[in-house]
Every structure is written in C-alpha cells, then in structure tokens.
C-alpha cells in the first residue's frame, strides 16, 4: 500500500491515517461507541448501516462553484441570469480561502484516505484521492467508486483530490460573495474539490461525475447521465437516458440482460463503460416484491442514508419524514446480473430517451433521425402531474439539457455532438420512448413499454410498418409484437383527434421556447428544424 503523505496538501499534525480501509474496519469505525451527531452509523435488521446527513438530504446546487481562471473561463457553461444553471463562478482568491478553511478542518486529526478510480476504462479513468474525517464518508466512496487492486494501490498517484470538510462552515460567506455557509467548489486547473458544511454523500459522487463531464468530452469521449445494459453475452449494448421517474432504473434492470451501470457512463472508441463501482438507489417506499434486486442488495457493506430505523434496527422504508430522497449505496457486485469483470461493453446499438409525458401527446415510441436525436437529447424533456388547489391535475414540464443539466460543465451542444459522433460510428439508432400518459388518461402500461423496449433491442422495430406523426414529424411503428397497436399513434387514444392536436400545439410551443437557449451557437441553430414545426 502506498505511503500517504498529507503534508504535501498542507494537512499537518495527522494523528492516524486509515488508508483504503476494509469493509470490516469501516463497519467498526462507523458504529463504535463515542461517535457524535451525524458521524453515528446505526446497524439495521438487514445488516446495512444507516446514517443521517442533517439538513442536507440532497445536493446543494446553489452552493456549487467552479473556479474561473484562464483554463475554465472560455470552456465552462457558466450560469447566467438569462439561462440559469449550477455552474457559479468563483474567484481564485476566494478558492484559496475556502480551500484553506477545509485544510485547517482536516489538520491534527485521525483521517480516512480512500484512493479509488472513476471510470472503468484504464486509458481515461481518473485516479481520485478522497480525504475525509468521517468513517461513513469513506464507506460511501468505497461503495461508489472503483476499488484499485493491491498492485494499483501500491503505485497510486491521484489525478484529482477531494477534501471533505463537512464539519466546517464558511462563516464569512457574505464577505466572500458566496450563497451560504455551505460550499462545494471545484478547481479544474489544480484538479481539486472542496466540500464544506454539507454531509450529503452524493456531493462526492456527483462531484466526480461533473468533473468527468468536463474532461472527457474535451478528449472526444461522450459522457452521459444514463443507465446501460447488455445481453447475456455482454453484447448488444443499450443506453437509457431519462430524468427521475421515467423508468431508467426499472427498464435497465432486466432479468434477461446484464447491468453495466445505473447512472453514469462514458462512450469512447472501445465502447460504453461505467464511471462507478456501485449503485446509489432511491429507497423511498422500497418493496421487496416489486424491486427484489435493490432490496436484496441492502445487506452488510451497503450504506443507507436518512432512512427511519427503530431502536431494534427495524427499517421503515415508507417513512419520508426526514426526506423523500432516502438512499442506499452498495457495491455493484451486490447485484447478480452484471457485466463482469469490468463494467463495460461494446459500442451501443440502441440509445433510448425516456420521457414520462403527462400532456398525453408523445407516441409510446418514435424512431429518431440523427438531427432529432440531438434536438430531443438537448431538450431532455419529461413532465409530471402536479395537483392544483382545486384538485385538477396539471402537467408540469421539465426540460433538463442532455437529461442531466445539473452535472454539465460544458455547453450542452458539446455532449450532443459527441453522442451523435459515437452513434454514427457504431450505426446506433435512437428512440424516444414515452413512459407517461395518453388520451385514455391512464399511464402507458409497463407491459407495453417493456414490449417496446424488447422490440427495439431485438431489431423488430426496424422491420415494422411506420407512419409519420404531424407537427413533430416523428416516425412511429403501427404494430409491434406484444404491444397494443391501438396506442402506437397517440391520436387514436383520444375520442376526438382535435383534442390531441390542441395539446400537441401547446407542447410543441413549449419545446420551441425552451430550445431558444441552445441557439447561441451555430450547432444549436442548425437543429431548430429538427424540432416541432407549427
């Protein structure tokens, strides 16, 4: 094991360094007597440990900063009042202050250092060193990142360093021009991240995802917020993009296929690869019967977050009194059907965009042209039904660039261009799959959606007769094996087709209005014609 010298980072007086602890050591450290506050880990009936993260039960997007310097000023997709995103600029002197604050917090203490990889491809992976003072934070990154072999650990040289000072606060934040006492800051040039005053584990996971989203596309590698799977031979790769609630995890966890990963992937000349070594699943309302894979993954070495646990260790997955964003992290080998030994597979043949359309307009499946692929990828659309005060349910649209706007560091058109380049090279086809509602007022059944996914993966959809849907110019199949053909043209699900037309016009206008922000460069302007035409 490499000798870890923290003095080169300005961290001095360390009383003990626990370097890449075993799961046994982590369990002992996070459940031992004498821990206080959010350091405490509680053993549960399933063997997994549960921890609480305080007021931050999710990411803190208003407190995310990137240092603006010569390297980043012209490459990062900066937050602007006109087109807001999470990339707030930070001055170099403010960075020096917050980094110093984090280092001071970590001095003169027992520390945990976890060296791990982000990225399953050895050529482009990032070697990351996490320096934390809390045992369960070391456990979290041990679960979520790819663990080095003994030999790799011996010669480990980090490309990137993360300082987690969750116990510190930026007390003079107003003077520094920051949003609050909490700060999650990145320096792209020095390759460092600082976390202050938030205990949420996901800041470390999504922090590294954001950084992969910066470095990889600049090397010509597609970086994607998606799940991915392959057939039982580890071939016929499929990628599933989709925002929360669209079925990304459900549809990629398929008993007939092998999981590559559930959230973050790259696509280079060798194929598709996972960034992670674990999964971070939502567990609110988790049911053993409907999601057995996730339920069975919650055992010793898994780490629950913000779940309600009784004194006797009994878990209440229904309780959302702390947060709806209750989570579990576990190493990917807790899932049986996975691609082994490395979470990677050949170039994708099928790319699926999942949208849950609450407007009832989009077809259950559309075969996209390359231009439509870029347009709908940039749009990143889904919609949910939100109750209004009179009990009427109104659809609320969400447009999130590339189905992952919160984690994009470059202009969204860069991600779209890289994805299409890779698709053209592998001959991949893209599909827009609506897992939402239609004119019946009911959600499209999971049986029909699975039938559609099966037809895409088998290639049957390419042999099906098709027709065009007006306004959107979508090509849709008129029949597919195992799918109710009465739903394939959404107009057929309305008693009166003019009702679909009115809703379609409304949704088309929303797409067009949202897309204006991408027309600030030539790549974006060229795609307007691929969107809805009124």
Curated annotation (Swiss-Prot):
Q: What does the Swiss-Prot or TrEMBL cofactor note state? A: Binds 1 Mn(2+) ion per subunit.
Highest taxon of the source? Bacteria
The protein's UniProt keywords, in alphabetical order, are: ATP-binding, Cytoplasm, Decarboxylase, Gluconeogenesis, Lyase, Manganese, Metal-binding, Nucleotide-binding
Q: Which residues bind substrate?
A: 59, 200, 206, 327
Its UniProt entry gives the catalysed reaction(s) as: oxaloacetate + ATP = phosphoenolpyruvate + ADP + CO2
Cite the binding residues for Mn(2+). Answer: 206, 225, 263
Q: Which GO terms describe its biological process?
A: gluconeogenesis
Keyword NADP included in the entry's annotation? no
Give the matching InterPro entries.
PEP_carboxykinase_ATP, PEP_carboxykinase_C, PEP_carboxykinase_N, PEPCK_ATP_CS
What enzyme class is recorded for this protein? lyase
Where is the protein found, in the record's own terms? Cytoplasm
Q: Which cofactor does it need?
A: Mn(2+)
Look up the EC number in the record and give it: 4.1.1.49
- Pfam families named among the record's database cross-references: PEPCK_ATP
Q: Which GO terms describe its cellular component?
A: cytosol
One annotated GO molecular function is: ATP binding
**UniProt binding sites for ATP:** 206, 225, 242-250, 291, 327, 443-444, 449
Keyword Metal-binding: yes or no?
yes
Show the PROSITE patterns listed in the entry: PEPCK_ATP (PS00532)
In terms of HAMAP family, this protein maps to:
PEPCK_ATP
Task: Sum up the protein's function in the record's words.
Answer: Involved in the gluconeogenesis. Catalyzes the conversion of oxaloacetate (OAA) to phosphoenolpyruvate (PEP) through direct phosphoryl transfer between the nucleoside triphosphate and OAA.
Q: Which family does it belong to?
A: Belongs to the phosphoenolpyruvate carboxykinase (ATP) family.
What protein am I looking at?
A: Phosphoenolpyruvate carboxykinase (ATP)
**Species in which this protein is naturally found:** Agathobacter rectalis (strain ATCC 33656 / DSM 3377 / JCM 17463 / KCTC 5835 / VPI 0990)
Name of the gene encoding the protein in the UniProt record: pckA
């Amino acid at each position: 094991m490499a000798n870890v010298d923290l003095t080169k980072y300005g961290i001095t007086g360390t009383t003990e360094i626990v370097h890449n602890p075993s799961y046994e050591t982590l369990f002992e450290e996070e459940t031992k007597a004498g821990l206080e506050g959010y350091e405490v880990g509680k053993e549960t009936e399933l063997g997994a440990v549960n921890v609480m993260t305080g007021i931050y039960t999710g990411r803190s997007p208003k407190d995310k900063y990137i240092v603006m310097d010569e390297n980043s000023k012209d490459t990062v997709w900066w937050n602007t009042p006109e087109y807001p995103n999470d990339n707030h600029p930070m001055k170099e002197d403010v960075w020096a202050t917050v980094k110093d604050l984090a280092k001071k917090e970590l001095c003169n203490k027992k520390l945990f250092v976890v060296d791990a990889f982000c990225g399953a491809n050895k050529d482009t992976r990032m070697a990351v060193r996490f320096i934390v003072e809390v045992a369960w934070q070391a456990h979290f990154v041990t679960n979520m990142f790819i663990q080095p072999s003994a030999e790799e650990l011996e010669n480990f040289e980090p490309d990137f360093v993360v300082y987690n000072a969750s116990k510190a606060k930026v007390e003079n934040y107003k003077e520094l021009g920051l949003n609050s006492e909490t700060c999650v800051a990145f320096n792209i040039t020095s390759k460092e991240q600082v976390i202050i005053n938030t205990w949420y584990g996901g800041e470390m996971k999504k922090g590294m995802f954001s950084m992969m989203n910066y470095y990889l596309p600049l090397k010509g590698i597609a970086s994607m917020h998606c799940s991915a799977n392959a057939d039982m031979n580890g071939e016929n790769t499929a990628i599933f993009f989709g925002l929360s609630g669209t079925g990304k995890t459900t549809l990629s966890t398929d008993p007939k296929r092998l999981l590559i990963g559930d959230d973050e992937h790259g696509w280079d000349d060798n194929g598709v690869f996972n960034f992670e070594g674990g999964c971070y699943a939502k567990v609110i309302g988790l049911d053993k019967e409907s999601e057995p894979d996730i339920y069975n993954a919650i055992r010793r070495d898994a780490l629950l977050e913000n779940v309600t646990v009784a004194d006797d260790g009994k878990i209440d997955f229904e309780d959302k009194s702390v947060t709806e964003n209750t989570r579990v992290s576990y190493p990917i080998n807790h899932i049986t059907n996975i691609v082994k030994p490395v979470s990677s597979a050949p170039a994708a043949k099928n790319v699926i965009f999942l949208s849950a359309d609450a407007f009832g307009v989009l077809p259950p499946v559309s075969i996209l042209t390359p231009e439509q692929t870029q347009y709908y990828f940039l749009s990143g659309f889904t919609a949910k039904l939100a109750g209004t005060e009179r009990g009427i349910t109104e659809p609320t649209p969400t447009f999130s660039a590339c189905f992952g706007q919160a984690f994009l560091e470059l202009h969204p058109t860069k991600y779209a261009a890289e994805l299409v380049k890779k698709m053209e090279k592998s001959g991949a086809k893209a599909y827009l799959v609506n897992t939402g509602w239609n004119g019946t007022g009911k959600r499209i059944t999971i049986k029909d959606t699975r039938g559609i996914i099966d037809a895409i993966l088998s290639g049957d959809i390419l042999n099906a007769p098709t027709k065009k849907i007006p306004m959107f110019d979508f090509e849709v199949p008129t029949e597919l094996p195992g799918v109710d053909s009465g739903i394939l043209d959404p107009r057929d699900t309305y008693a009166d087709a003019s009702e679909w037309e009115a809703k379609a016009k409304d949704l088309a206008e929303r797409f067009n209005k949202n897309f204006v922000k991408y027309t600030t460069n030539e790549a974006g302007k060229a795609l307007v014609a691929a969107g809805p035409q009124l």
